[in-house]
Amino acid sequence: MSTLRFRNALPSDAVRCHEIESTAYEGDEAATLAKIETRIGQYPQGFLILEDAGHIVGFINSGCAHDVVMSDEAFKELVGHSADAPNVVIMSVVVDPASQGKGYSTALMREFVQRMTALHKATIHLMCKERHVSLYERMGYRYVQPSPSDHGGMAWHEMVMELPGA
């Protein structure tokens, strides 16, 4: 039986997270090591790690904004991020391909939503590919619109979840 543990990211996790991101995402959509280091350094509360038996198998990272513009590429480097802002913007939900199919992304998202609710956030926003829209709808997200973003040269769709008490 595996031992799952959630925790916030530490600077020493950046290289492993970059390995997972580079392996799981296609083309130019993976964040650089520098972006991952920035996200850990500036908003560790929004960078959730999932470990299985002490080994990092996945993570979610995010930033917060007062006004959400999902196509804002600069925000991926946390330009405009404000930890006290009410709206969370997820930049990556990623599980090591060798560990996919075990329900880890759903477990990560449930824990992430609980943590953001505890921080009194109002909404969580994300962009996903068309094939993931129904997955996020099952997790409680609402479809917003096709995104004007062409991050990584791909088509994206914007989703949002309103959190309890918002």
Feature names for model-found ranges:
Residues 91, 98-100, 119-125, 134, ...:
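Acidic/histidine-enriched, beta-strand-rich ligand/metal-binding domains
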Residues 26-80:
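Active-site rim helix/loop that mediates acceptor-substrate recognition in acyltransferases
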Residues 109, 114-129:
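Conserved GNAT acetyl-CoA-binding A-motif
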Residues 64-67, 125-127, 137, 142-158:
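Conserved catalytic-core motifs of GNAT/GCN5-like acyltransferases
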Residues 56, 60-100, 110, 149-156:
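Conserved acyl-donor/pantetheine-binding loop and adjacent beta-alpha core of acyl/acetyltransferases
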Residues 4-17:
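A short beta-loop-alpha structural element at the N-terminal edge
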